[in-house]
Amino acid sequence: MQPRTPLTLCVLLSQVLLVTSADDLECTPGFQRKVLHIHQPAEFIEDQPVLNLTFNDCKGNEKLHYEVSSPHFKVNSDGTLVALRNITAVGRTLFVHARTPHAEDMAELVIVGGKDIQGSLQDIFKFARTSPVPRQKRSIVVSPILIPENQRQPFPRDVGKVVDSDRPEGSKFRLTGKGVDQDPKGTFRINENTGSVSVTRTLDRETIATYQLYVETTDASGKTLEGPVPLEVIVIDQNDNRPIFREGPYIGHVMEGSPTGTTVMRMTAFDADDPATDNALLRYNIRQQTPDKPSPNMFYIDPEKGDIVTVVSPALLDRETLENPKYELIIEAQDMAGLDVGLTGTATATIVIDDKNDHSPKFTKKEFQATVEEGAVGVIVNLTVEDKDDPTTGAWRAAYTIINGNPGQSFEIHTNPQTNEGMLSVVKPLDYEISAFHTLLIKVENEDPLVPDVSYGPSSTATVHITVLDVNEGPVFYPDPMMVTKQENISVGSVLLTVNATDPDSLQHQTIRYSIYKDPAGWLSINPINGTVDTTAVLDRESPFVHNSVYTALFLAIDSGNPPATGTGTLLITLEDINDNAPVIYPTVAEVCDDARNLSVVILGASDKDLHPNTDPFKFEIHKQTVPDKVWKISKINNTHALVSLLQNLNKANYNLPIMVTDSGKPPMTNITDLRVQVCSCKNSKVDCNGAGALHLSLSLLLLFSLLSLLSGL
């Protein structure tokens, strides 16, 4: 294989489009010159020819169409390259794509003296024309294939060719990779004999921007002879995607009175086209402003950044003078750097003029009047204010303060959150007899502080005159409750105390009468004129109406007003205990086995309704007048309990044992209670008392039998 010159290699690497049949040597479709040079002028002038390009598809150039990599240039039908506007910098390289139904090709225009700029299509090529290409020991020569997206029928369409100068006779080309035998399968194919590469369908750069294919040569059996060699297919972007605003809704806020040039918000659109080209180079503008007052141009948008800023004087951003403190802007984003040929997308930006506290609240009048009955509490008057600020903010919400006339803290004022009114309330009942008139000084402020150049004036204070109305108040007992201590069982008719009630309405000189309101046991009476309370029955500390030795009664004091007013007083009578209750024993029934080894019968307890010292220690005894000493025994356990036991076993029967118990009062109280003892048959852990009733014996008979037994023993 002979070494190739650099020029030959450069030509092969730049070959990217259709090459006609090798038999057709008279006409080669494509540009006659693949690389052209242009000296960078001071400025490219609009509509001034730059150079002429020659393209021939060998079929008459029917429906010839040109595309230029820069939106600032175009190629006329005669092949003349012209600028669309005056421009100074276009980069180092331009690419011109020519296409007819029969052929297409790409020409490179090198700008001598040009500088790199963002967006040059040179970046999409994976090989550098200014760098030497490393020499490789292979005969397969491939160049990147450039295919514009969105091509139309007919398909398949030849897009490039692979050259193998040393390919053995009978060998074939084979193409593999993504888009051939990998998804999306069948997009590309190669003529196994000629090496022509074709595309079978429309490509979409936004779906797949590049395809990495591999070329190799095989023999007739499919065995690889050379390769695989990478073949890159680059999809050239077309401006087929509109800018889209994807982050809405767009809502911005700006404070009223903000200086000119205040940034409100940023609008950002997205374009799916190639960001390295002008197809995705966006420019922003405001298409419409609603409302259009006080100026149709309240805002400006930076065409490149999308920042929306204010452009009017601070005085025009006065929320209180605007018909509507909310503006809606239709924002348009246009690609192709804003040229008329660019695609557009729109979105709505809502801008709210926020309120600041530049208006102080003012009372609607300087003086307010209110009346309230003495003794009443609650709201007595609503104080109204005006404030021009936004009702949804702390710049409008009012805060009221009583700054004078409330030494006893009888009044409070709160803000009604719905109306912003000040609700003045009485929280401690007023007394007409003490003061019939009150004057309060009220101050109103906002929750938020005022701006520095605004202050609270005289209109931010108001005077409230309050008139207290006299009402007939009920008499008041003093003291309340009234307390007295008496011994229970005092004689009927005893005087307990004299109650006293006074009328708060001292200026009315009313008389007071007394009556009983509640006397649960019916023990008391009261003199209606002088309030003397005496007993009508015996007081009993042990009564169910007495709780913790205290008896409670209620009395009424009624004045002579029209209508009369009533006051209630409570009498608490503490009853001292006397020994008027005898103790009682428990239990009163017991069982014992007739053959019991343990002769204990029962443990007795005693209780007494009285209090110490009229209760325990109790004294337990067997009433000896009716019971023999040698049968029963009672023993003291403690102050409240005793043990009853047998001295010998008894026959199965029921026995009544009289128990006498005495308390410790002075004088003491005694009670005798029969203890019923059942002597039962106990066999095999079973207790049988059923037959005991049939042998019921009184203790007197038991005594008789005991005496006979003693006599017979003599």
UniProtKB/Swiss-Prot annotation:
Example GO molecular function: low-density lipoprotein particle binding
Basic and acidic residues compositional bias, start-end: 158-172
InterPro entries noted in UniProt: Cadherin (IPR039808), Cadherin-like_dom (IPR002126), Cadherin-like_sf (IPR015919), Cadherin_CS (IPR020894), Cadherin_pro_dom (IPR014868)
Principal place of residence: membrane
SMART domains: CA, Cadherin_pro
Keywords from the named record: Calcium, Cell adhesion, Cell membrane, Cleavage on pair of basic residues, Cytoplasm, Glycoprotein, GPI-anchor, Lipoprotein, Membrane, Metal-binding, Repeat, Signal
Glycosylation sites per record: 382, 489, 500, 530, 598, 638, 671
Subcellular location: Cell membrane; Cytoplasm
Residue span, Cadherin domain: 143-245, 246-363, 364-477, 478-585, 586-680
GO cellular component, one term: caveola
Entry membrane topology: Lipid-anchor; GPI-anchor
Biological process, per Gene Ontology: calcium-dependent cell-cell adhesion via plasma membrane cell adhesion molecules; cellular response to toxic substance; cellular response to xenobiotic stimulus; endothelial cell migration; homophilic cell adhesion via plasma membrane adhesion molecules; keratinocyte proliferation; lamellipodium assembly; localization within membrane
Region annotation Disordered: where it falls in the sequence: 156-183
Listed Pfam families: Cadherin, Cadherin_pro
Secretion signal, residue range per the UniProt entry: 1-22
Role played: Cadherins are calcium-dependent cell adhesion proteins. They preferentially interact with themselves in a homophilic manner in connecting cells; cadherins may thus contribute to the sorting of heterogeneous cell types. May act as a negative regulator of neural cell growth.
Entry remark concerning the domains of this protein: Three calcium ions are usually bound at the interface of each cadherin domain and rigidify the connections, imparting a strong curvature to the full-length ectodomain.
Subunit structure: By contrast to classical cadherins, homodimerization in trans is not mediated by cadherin EC1 domain strand-swapping, but instead through a homophilic adhesive interface which joins two elongated EC1-EC2 domains through a region near their Ca2+-binding sites to form a tetrahedral, X-like shape.
Name of the featured protein: Cadherin-13
Organism annotation: Mus musculus (Mouse)
Organism ancestry: Eukaryota, Metazoa, Chordata, Craniata, Vertebrata
